[in-house]
């Protein structure tokens, strides 16, 4: 908690301006000072380079400055001349087309391209690279890169934060600099980070809207060299206001400067004036693209009118000309609109959008700030319900509102640093020629930008600098993805492709190389086929080793020459892949792989958690994420090539199974470890990994030697034999599982060699209430550690009954009992149904139903597209959708609205059935399941159901049973399920309306593990 100091706006502005004026004095930047380019922006044929430097003579003080230099950029457009003569009057250049150009040394299709200087009147007119930002072009056409560390070769002076130099253009400016390697750094230079957040008023009956509701406060927090500046602007038309804290504890955080405004329009204008005074490099918000920025500009328009609002909300920095906020419209996977906001002189990152669209963060329960902060920072927000905030504001007690507002800015700043977003962003800039504004762009845009430049600068081979350029016409991808159509044509089939639309000259079938691979025909329907999944053998296993391929798909793409420039159409009507490993994509992947190996090696030479260790680790992790994302590009734009990659992966996994199982009873292993027998059995495999059960006579190895021996056997014999048989491909030992519960594909859990339980695809789904997940995991953990099923189920019953009795006390724990569902205005399912039956009523999902309920009474956060809405079921006589009730509005003490445990018990039923499938039918399942259900339904009036054991029927050969369980996965992987799978159970539970008669059960046998401990 921080103390709040009330200040006048003029006093705060003077204080901040004084700090800025102190830095206007002459500062010398010399060869001993390392600088980092934090951002670049381009306008009117001039490049503005924002830099942060560590001043060696001033104890490495952080100094921010900028340089401005003339910079001519160039674009490309098609030349439609006849080219009858040897030269073109437009001075065009002929490039091989990057997408399916033909076959090297036989025939390649050409594209005639004119390179022209960009100007304001010719910016994107008929431009083939119109999707590039100007800073992308700077990265491609100069040696300057955002995120780059540099030094000036000679000393230069800075006055008013502006670098004085004599460079006439950007190329002279480049010659003034030398690049600094990361290994030469003594201090990391991070951008100065700011975050803002607004709190809005409402009538308590609906969500805030800028046309009707005002802004209560705007908080800003700036982190510069680990020190915070905290400011909160608040609006209250009347005096006085109470900013005294109700807490008696001393403040643990820096003071917050609070400024009282009696006019809301003045407060909004002051916020935009703060940006240049605070001079951050990065401006964060949390859901700002959808809420905060539109609300700020909406209120400014409402209060001032469009003309005055445009002036008040301009973005300024240093003495540069103020500019408008730039918006760009994009779409998510559900075709919902999203407006991104760009602040020109600052890097703007909506942290909510970053987290919710990055697959690295899929394990989060939801993307609300409190959830994210608890997951990554082990911190939580200040709790302030909307109705309490409105009451406090009405009573002019603003201290908690200020504290709440400021904390909502502190957490995103800490998340930005914790998740190392700056390093990931700058690594993308340096490797893929992206700009900092591309951070939130989708993967297809990012890879397209990289391919555009790499195609133009391609060479014959990595070791041969002879130019071999291609031109990447992005619009060819509309054909390869099957999306091209005329404006008056209906949308094509999702899987149909017609590559004849590219109008490529077919290669004579007689000239096709023997090594070329047939991918598809020029016209066909192509569906995506995923990686191989070896049919799991369900059950409980001990001593299981997992082997993983190192970067399987990137390795396949490197060694198979996977690249759009290697694909060609032949005269036999088929499409082929020429395995040229010197193509653009294989060389990119090889570069990424070699860089990652180098940085991992440098990291491992450093002391753990030291400055260099963390620096190298951040870079190698960013390289890994970039390389792994490239495969998905082909799944979007050319499925036949993606299918070839997965086909090769399936073949490799199948090869592993044969080689591993052939090593059973290897004489070398038996002799070295003194064993009479050893059997390797692959019990499961998924895409790039396989599970190997190691069977041996445990009596022949001392208990303290077993784990070490298994590790040595698998690592030094199994892995080595596999890797020695390949060229380029490599497998590594990922883990030794002391015990494993394998349920079905992509669903298992295990006890690792550090005695920690890990879950994959099982008991992790976000829709399962947290209290059930905790109870289920405690049960499974006891089973993995050798406890009996009766002992584990007794623990389950004990915990489930305790959670039932604790429901609603305290109120903050309600979130542990709820479900959640993603909200989308337009889902793909609803779209498909609409196409099938236009007269059909729109589908109202649980999420839509709950959002409508939330919008009416007013809440502090109204879920948008992609947000997960938390809800419970209430005990009313309705269908499931109508039973759903938003958690934010649910009161556990309400006499009229009680919770329904219907869905909770259905989830418990699924869990019990999963355990039966592993451990077989036992009387303890029926006993404990019945006891739990009886307690939970004791006060429920409607939809009470009881567990009944129903005999199972074997699935017919070739058909897989469809089951609607809580953890089911939908995927398109190639499944090796056999026609029949042996089972060790004869019946499973089903929930019925009629309560069954239960047989009395005596005491269960004592748990051997518990007896041994006692």
Curated annotation (Swiss-Prot):
Coiled coil: none annotated. SUPFAM superfamilies: DNA/RNA polymerases, Ribonuclease H-like. InterPro entries: DNA-dir_DNA_pol_B (IPR006172), DNA-dir_DNA_pol_B_CS (IPR017964), DNA-dir_DNA_pol_B_exonuc (IPR006133), DNA-dir_DNA_pol_B_multi_dom (IPR006134), DNA/RNA_pol_sf (IPR043502), DNA_pol_B_thumb (IPR042087), DNA_pol_palm_dom_sf (IPR023211), DNA_pol_type-B (IPR050240). GO terms for molecular function: DNA binding; DNA-directed DNA polymerase activity; nucleotide binding. It catalyses: DNA(n) + a 2'-deoxyribonucleoside 5'-triphosphate = DNA(n+1) + diphosphate. PANTHER family: DNA POLYMERASE CATALYTIC SUBUNIT, DNA POLYMERASE DELTA CATALYTIC SUBUNIT. Belongs to the DNA polymerase type-B family. This is DNA polymerase.
